[in-house]
Each structure stands twice: as C-alpha cells, then as structure tokens.
Amino acid sequence: MNQCDTVVSSASSEAQRLARLALLQVVDTAAEPFFDALAAAAQAIAGTPIALVSLVDERRQWWKANIGLPGVSETPRELAFCAYTIQGDAVMEVRDAPADPRFHDNALVTDAPGIRYYAGAPIVLPDGLRMGTVCVIDQRARALEPAQLQALQQLA
C-alpha cells in the first residue's frame, strides 16, 4: 500500500470525484488567465517563491497554473502534498516538511525542489467534491499568519 492509498477517504467518493474531474475537462488544457491570476494572488498573499493551482487525478497532480517551477507540469500523486489537502475542507499547512513524518522522506522534500514549507487550500465544488488545491511552497521553513491562511482558503 502506498501513501496515496492511505489518504483516499472512500473508494466511492474518490470514484465520484475522479468522474467529476474528468467531466470538467480541465486537466491537460492550456494555461488560462483566471487560473494564472489565482496562483499570482496566492503567491502575493504568502510571499512564497512557488504558487500552484493543482488538480489531482488518479495517478498525478497536474498544475493548471504554475509560478516558480518552470518546465514542470505535474508530479506523481504519491508524492503530492495536495493529495493530503483534498482529504479535508480547510487549509493544510506544513511548516517544516523534513520534520513532518508524512513528508520527511518525500522526494519533493529530499530532492528538487526541496520543499520545506507548504500551505494548500482545497478547491471544493458546490456539492463538496474536492478537485485540487490552490497552494504555496517555499524552500525554507515558515508559518503564515491566520489572515494569510484565510485569504488562501478564500482564493480556493
């Protein structure tokens, strides 16, 4: 069993979520100003070098908007911090990834891009299905202020 298997809340809700994501036909599409603006706003709020709008499918997280990770458009789901974030309704903040037992041996922490900090807010549809995240990343440990976390949640 991999990390991905441990974070899926239930097979039926995950199947419903994946079906809705496919129906939206947004994964693997071209950049759009709206999503780029969401990532830029998240970056400005948090003051981080990296901001993403991430969509999580069955095998990967794919970035609809990407600031700070040039040349990369996805990562395997089993490495995705966002796969954890979509399990809840609130912002997930990881203040020091190497010290967090969920992520200390994650290749995104131990290798490039060297994630130390992550905060992500789930993108939740009106019916409660979570499609992905608006997230920010830094290569240094830190903490956002409550108002910044709330603003990130509102963006999502």
Show the residue positions of the predicted features.
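Amphipathic alpha-helical regulatory segments at dimerization interfaces
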Residues: L24, D36-I45, Y84-G88, V109
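Glycine-rich acetyl-CoA-binding "A-motif" of GNAT/NAT acetyltransferases
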Residues: R130
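Signal-transmission linkers at sensory-effector interfaces
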Residues: M1-P33
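Helix-loop-beta substructure at the N-terminus of cytosolic sensory domains
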Residues: D28-Q61
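A short, aliphatic-rich beta-strand micro-motif
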Residues: R116-D127
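Short beta-strand-to-loop transition segments that serve as allosteric relay/switch motifs
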Residues: T133-R142
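Regulatory sensory and allosteric helical modules in signal-transduction proteins
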Residues: R20, P49-I50, V56, R60-K64, ...
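Amphipathic alpha-helical "output/dimerization" segments
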Residues: L144-A156
